[in-house]
């Protein structure tokens, strides 16, 4: 159920250490106006929908299927939200969830921890976030990383994200850190919109001027999003005492690169042997990107992925994942990995749990329309 794509020795040691452990899950919600660019993301049918994607995902993650959600999951052009995968695992194993608002236009409808962040401007402006806000969010991330490590002293922390447009800010941060990520990132589209992403990134980076040995905080302030810096601080602090899985694809590879830059620039203490990136097979083997090649450009990052396959699902909304739609989000890959690592779940057990949630949603929709 789990494949290792890079740094097999480090990854295998991490998996062995945390086999049988129940993780805790920190989901960091953020927002960037980059997500409003037409066509930049498929996580929400329209730019208007995308403003509420993270809030709707958070509500479903915590509450599951309810008859009258305050924020219904946005209509995706093709495929259901990856939060169905995350929720299936969270519900089955009662994994503790900590929701963090790093900077949303509106507050979530379920209990959350407010980090006093703000939504990011479009990265093309070269002024995504005020620098003092970036420092504040990093400090908050470190503080909560330390707190969460005390809650799970012999286990690991999964850090997930929900940021529409986040693979584009990830590309910008990676490129700013000197990683040649152009053409290698993923997106929620079946064929990644590399040219569009790259043109937006170039606009933002040009306004920064020289990129040689750039201060990572200044880089995030210019072209990043609020989730990235919180996740970096949280992972750095938690890694000192417990395991950390950055649960995501391109966005979490960018966070890993950011972590390395922060450690290098500011001599922050961290234990990178405790840190892995966990995603889905649809991201790791995405032929319209090059996730494995990207991971290999970031020294020593262990990349794992669930081998969950949805071809045999009875729901077309799940089968389309095998055609390249959606791929990842809300820690879906990490949660699928956790289901195997904690309780040895098979492919069929996980599929049954996901389909059970979809069946509930379909039933509620039929009742609502009748």
From Swiss-Prot:
Residue spans crossing the bilayer? none
The record's SUPFAM superfamilies line, in alphabetical order, gives: Nicotinate mononucleotide:5,6-dimethylbenzimidazole phosphoribosyltransferase (CobT)
Identify a single GO molecular function assigned to this protein.
nicotinate-nucleotide-dimethylbenzimidazole phosphoribosyltransferase activity
InterPro entries xrefs: Nict_dMeBzImd_PRibTrfase, Nict_dMeBzImd_PRibTrfase_arc, Nict_dMeBzImd_PRibTrfase_sf
> Record's family?
Belongs to the UPF0284 family.
* Name of the protein: UPF0284 protein PCC7424_2681
